[in-house]
Structures are given as structure tokens and as C-alpha cells.
């Protein structure tokens, strides 16, 4: 009997006993569980499943009164079904310890998309981006920024640095369900309640030429009249007094701005301006809450109830300090600091031309649009993870682990989702395949080698190898560097450099021979080390030299030692030796010549002559 069948038989026996007795004890459950299940959480999951079958698990055997409440059921089919389910759960519990299996299993639960499903998700991505654009269009300076970029294009800058396309309003795109209201209006307040659930649920193309798109977005009917009729940098008080016509013009600007598809760099610049304003606002609000709640001991609930709509009312803290509350006196001491923070909020309102509520509303609308686009992109990515697996399998054994190939392919998949244009008519998988292959091959070229080689050099090496194989088939032998250079139209020196770079490094621990006791590093010569023969020869020469010098007089031996630096740090000139002996340099030369004549005598020279041959 196989291990799995035996395991299922034991579980079936356990469940049958539980149904006959009406209960099980923890000891009985523990005796019947497989030995490899020891995690307390896994045991709790199994006991919970047994309880779901109607079998109670007790610390010890219950009394007779408790057993009367349980109905014994020994249905064989029910026991087998329960045992199979429990065995499957146990197998699943063990399987979840492997992150790769978890990834594969969760990936398999997502259904593949049809062409219509891809279009629907792509439209949701566009709709989310349109909502973001519509929200930031109401932020002061946004339209001015776009018109400034349009002027740069007219002066010769590349349009592709500003726009990536234009969403045709006449196309069958699912338009936003409602217009994006102007922040601060009643319509915006009403829509805020309707979108609360949308925001909380998120934790976190045949296109026209861009030139025509930007020209359309800067129609004279709005953009030319825009600076003169009302300023994008007016203060909040002036904006609250807008006549209805100017409000419609502002909405028209937002409507024109929404279809524009900016390049990511330009899009991020505009979004970052809104985020920066909100971060400055939040920073001051947190400082005020810290002063009130932490320092003045004001209840947090009271602060959250009283502070909204009083962000820029500099009399707010003073009025609260006059109340008869436990924290009023402490709040009065912090009044100056609170007013200073409120003054910074007033300065922010003056700088942006928006009230605090309007800044929050613009950011809320922008966050909702980003959440919609992010969710749609996530669905598109998850539905195509299997495509990455199928492509990554073709690039195994090229220097990167399979999981690394999958991760690099997923990066390419996410880029494909960002750049997919469903209006061109092809399926997403057709388009994404090239992005995934590009990401995987680039990562292999960039990371697979121990010594990194630039990607352009990798491409040259691959081309060289391909042509070398072709020439090998044509000529029946390996081509020479000269022949390769002629075929590739490259200098011979560069061909030799490429061939040298193309060599793969090997480990010094590579086994050599059948016994594998020796390694490649054992056979590599260390050029910095002296050979034993050379060291022995030098030592013998030193000993022979000392013996020969010992046959001279002490004065002659010392002169020769000083002249040639024997047993000294350096040699000496005749002048230096003469000063040592307090004689002239000529006398030292005579002593040296006499010592040389003695050394040339055959009885002494024969000891040193043998070293000349070595």
C-alpha cells in the first residue's frame, strides 16, 4: 500500500471512530496524524475540519450526558468522502510551505482573458487615467504647464517628450460615468460620498498623431481665452466667487485635458505637484493634532470632531481654551504654536489658490483614479502570468535560475500592460510576448556571467558565434580571426578581443580526473612563488661564498663584503670603504685586487665555478 493510501486509510479509521463514539480526543487525533505534520497551526486546521464534520474533539472522554447529545453516524460513503477531503487538506497544507508551488497554484486559479476581456480591462485602465487627469486639471498651474510644454514643442522640442497619444472621444471607449466635478462645489461633495467605497476598497488604440492631439487640446475657444478670462492662480476667495460661466469654462478645460495621454515623466510631474501640496497640508495637520492630543491631552475623538472645517480659523484654539474643560488650560498654552501651523496652511491656500478642502478633494479624486487603473493593471498581469512561465521555460540553463527568469519576465509583462494599445487590433499576449522575451534576454545578458559584460558586447559575441558556426559548416573547419573579420566587416584586432572576452570563466574547484580528489586550482602555477630548486641553489651559493671568503684575511674579506653588499643591506663605493678603514680609495682598490687574485686560484675558484653553469 502506498504512503498516501495508507495515510487516507488511517484518517478514514479516525473519522469512523469519531462517528461511532460521537467524539474524538486530542490524543486519538494525534495518534492518527502523519508524522510529518507537527506545526500547531496545521493541527488546528485539521481539528477545525473534523469539527466541521460534526465530530467534537475533547481533551478527554466526555461523560454520558454529553454523549446523548451526539448522534452516531457510521455511513461508509460519508467517512470515505470526509477522509479524502481531510487528506487533501493535509496535502495542501504541506504543499504551501513551498513558495514556488504556492505561486503556481494561485496563478492557476486566475482564468485566461478573452479578447473582449482584454479590451474591457484596457478601457478600465484608460478610464482610471482619465479620472486622474480630470482631477489634476483642477489643480492650479496644470493647464498652464501643458500649454508651456506646447510652446516648447512649437520652438522645436520633440512632441514625444510630452505626449504619448490621445484618447479619441468619438471612439467606443467607456466614458466616465459622470463628469469630474469642480472641487469645492456641491456636486463634488455629493460625489465624494458615492466614491468612498471605491477608495476604501483599494489598499494601496488607433490614436491620432500627437501633434494633432496637442493642437486639439489647445483650441483657441478655451486655451487662448483662458489666461485673460480667469487666472489659474487666483486665491480661494476669488475662486469661490466664480460666475457660472467661468465654472463651465474650467470644467471645459478639464474635459479637454482628460483625453490627453502624457508620457510617464510628464504625468508624474503633475501628480507629484498635487501630492506635494497634500503632504505639506498633512504635515501641518499632524503637527496641530500632536499639539492638541499629545501635549494638551485633548481627547482624540473631540479633536477629530472639532478640527475639520476649522483648519485655517486662527481663533479656533483660543475659543476652545476658554471652555470649561480639563484640557482647556493646556490647550491655551499651545495656542501660539497652533496658530503658527494654521498660518502655514493659510500660506499654502494662498500659494495654490485652493482651500484645504479643495486640495483634499483633488487628491481624493486622483487617488480613486489611480486605484482603478492599478486594479485593472493587476488583473491584466495576473491573467497573463502563465504566458511568462511558458516563455521563461525556453531560456533555462543559460546562467539564471528559473525563478529569476520568471521575475524578469514579470517585469517585462508589467511594462507591456502599461504600453498596451488595444485599438491596434492585436491580442495582448501577442504584444506582451516581445516585452517578456526582451526582459528575459536582457537580464540573461546582464546578469548571467560571473564577470559582467556590457549588453552591446554580448550581442556582438552572439553574432560572432553565429557566423562562426555558419563558416564551420561551409568550410569544414574553424574559421580564423582574419576570415571572421572579413565576413563581419570588423578589424582583426577587434575580432581577437571579442574572442578573448567570450571565454567563459571556470571554477578553480573543478574536479580533475576520475577520483575527483584533485582540483583545477592544484595545477595552476603560482608565478609569484620561487621554485624549490632556485631557493636551494641560492642557499648553496651563500654557503660557498662564505667558505671562500673565510680563506682570505679579515681585512680582505671585509672589503669584498662591503664592496658587493654580502650579508649587508647595500654595496659600498671605494670612497665609502676607504672612510671605514681610514685609508685612501687607492689603497682599498689595491686590497680588493689582491683579494681577487687569491680567489682566482684554482683551489678556491672551483667551489664557485659550478654555479656559473646554473
Swiss-Prot record:
UniProt GO cellular component terms: cytoplasm
Pfam families per UniProt: Sigma70_ner (PF04546), Sigma70_r1_1 (PF03979), Sigma70_r1_2 (PF00140), Sigma70_r2 (PF04542), Sigma70_r3 (PF04539), Sigma70_r4 (PF04545)
Function (record text): Sigma factors are initiation factors that promote the attachment of RNA polymerase to specific initiation sites and are then released. This sigma factor is the primary sigma factor during exponential growth.
Acidic residues bias (residue ranges): 193-209
Region annotation (Sigma-70 factor domain-4) ranges: 548-601
Subunit details: Interacts transiently with the RNA polymerase catalytic core.
Domain of life: Bacteria
Protein name according to UniProt: RNA polymerase sigma factor RpoD
Cytoplasm as UniProt keyword: yes
A GO biological process held by the record: DNA-templated transcription initiation
Region (Sigma-70 factor domain-2): 380-450
GO molecular-function terms, A-Z: DNA binding; sigma factor activity
Region (Sigma-70 factor domain-3): 459-535
Chain residue ranges for the region called Disordered: 168-245
Gene this protein is translated from: rpoD
